[in-house]
Amino acid sequence: MINFKKQIMKKTTFFLCAMLLVSSILIAPRSSLAYPFWAQQNYESPREATGKIVCANCHLAQMPTIAEVPQAVGADSVFKAVVKIPYKDDIKEIGADGSEVPLQVGAVVMLPDGFKLAPQERWTDEIKEETEGVYFTNYSEEKENIIIVGPLPGDTNKEIIFPVLSPNPATNKEYHYGKYSLHIGGNRGRGQVYPTGDKSNNVIFTSSSAGTINSIETIEDGSYQINIENENGEITTEAVPVGPKLIVKEQDQITVGAPLTSDPNVGGFGQLDAEVVLQSPYRIIGLIAFFIGVGLTQILLVLKKKQVEKVQAAEGI
């Protein structure tokens, strides 16, 4: 009887936890499912064949992203890939509920095959301090060379440090020394389009028809319905969600594609490529040996020249 009660309690607890998880997913506003999770859910790879990172499909505005990586790294070594996501301080954007919220940022770093996020036991104290509060995830279980971060509070994360571990060709013959490319993307703010193709409330809304604005209705949740009457007396209704500010009024004459709202977007996405050389230790040793050889040759030439000068002086030449 006691075991039966325990089983009932376990099943009840599991059921409640499952319901809580499902409810949190369904009830959570769309902004909580922001970059980069939708990219993971909708694209096998974050980079298209054209070279475009898929985040640009939803984040239509372009803004700069800066990356700093070492020119060369050694095998089986930890180095920092720094992604900078600049924007003006104290900027706020429109949240999914129409309220003003601080900007969030995110980044994706596509490393060459064999490179991956360095294990935490190999992080230096400096890296641990610089990455405090930052949670790194792989794009998928099969792609550990693709690291994503975000969304994070933008005010304190305009510079994101990625600790990267390089491969060792000496122990894994799949990898080789040489030059490799990295593909990097950085985003600030919400997107303008959802992966479903629907507009978010972080974009300009335009008219799909020409005519006169017959009426503007304010809905209980703060959104609008704009009724446009064309020259034939037909009414087209444009729905504007809560957030964007209307720039039209009743009796305004508008054309197809005319803006109905201001542009609320203050963010944007940017991508770039970088290069890093996986340096062979034998090449470094060879380079050092070459410089030593050149130095010794120069010294021998100077000594030989002085010897010749002494002989010439002795012979009175």
Swiss-Prot record:
Transmembrane segments: 284-304
Keywords of the record: Electron transport, Heme, Iron, Membrane, Metal-binding, Photosynthesis, Signal, Thylakoid, Transmembrane, Transmembrane helix, Transport
Biological processes per GO annotation: photosynthesis
Role: Component of the cytochrome b6-f complex, which mediates electron transfer between photosystem II (PSII) and photosystem I (PSI), cyclic electron flow around PSI, and state transitions.
PANTHER family: CYTOCHROME F, PTHR33288
Family: Belongs to the cytochrome f family.
Protein name (record): Cytochrome f
Organism name: Prochlorococcus marinus (strain MIT 9515)
